[in-house]
């Protein structure tokens, strides 16, 4: 069953609204129709089984059938500190790490990093990585979306580890 993380504001008491990329995915890719069931979560405190009632190009509306208890994430949180690899390999690290349960990703620039790091593109890159983490969490049926931080220096990584 498909799982979607939606903002808390889109959760009503008896229904949910799915908008944006997730609505596009449901309508165009999954070809969802009224009557299909999905799981929706805000990634924080609510998870529900819902049945699609209305399908539009930009918005999918679903009635909440039952609220589900959120299963606990592991008590031990795994953080992945990864020096920036070549090409799009960081995306693979985030995707696979999310699927196996990582809670946070800390990309960093080290002395031996080959990639030419461009600080101007950091915001866009971090947003892309966060989107990949969200999609991997949906696919792996995780309850929470891992945090993908901006690029750090090795010294900053060591300071965070000391806390």
Protein language model features and the residues they cover:
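RNA substrate-binding interface of SAM-dependent RNA methyltransferases
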Residues: 71-163
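N-terminal positively charged helical leader segments and presequences
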Residues: 1-69, 120
């Amino acid at each position: 069953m498909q799982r979607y993380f939606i903002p808390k504001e889109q959760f009503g008491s008896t229904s949910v609204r799915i908008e944006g990329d997730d609505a596009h995915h449901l309508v165009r890719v999954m070809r969802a129709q009224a009557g299909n069931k999905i799981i929706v979560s805000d990634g924080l405190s609510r998870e529900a089984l819902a049945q699609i009632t209305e399908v539009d190009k930009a918005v999918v509306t679903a009635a909440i059938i039952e609220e589900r208890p959120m299963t606990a994430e592991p008590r031990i949180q795994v953080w992945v500190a990864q020096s920036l690899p070549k090409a799009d390999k960081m995306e693979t690290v985030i995707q696979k790490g999310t699927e196996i349960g990582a809670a946070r990703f800390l990309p960093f620039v080290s002395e031996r990093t080959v990639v030419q790091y461009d600080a101007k593109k950091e915001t866009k890159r971090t947003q892309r990585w966060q989107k990949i983490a969200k999609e991997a969490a949906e696919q792996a049926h995780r309850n929470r979306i891992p945090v993908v931080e901006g690029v750090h220096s090795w010294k900053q990584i060591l300071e965070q580890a000391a806390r």
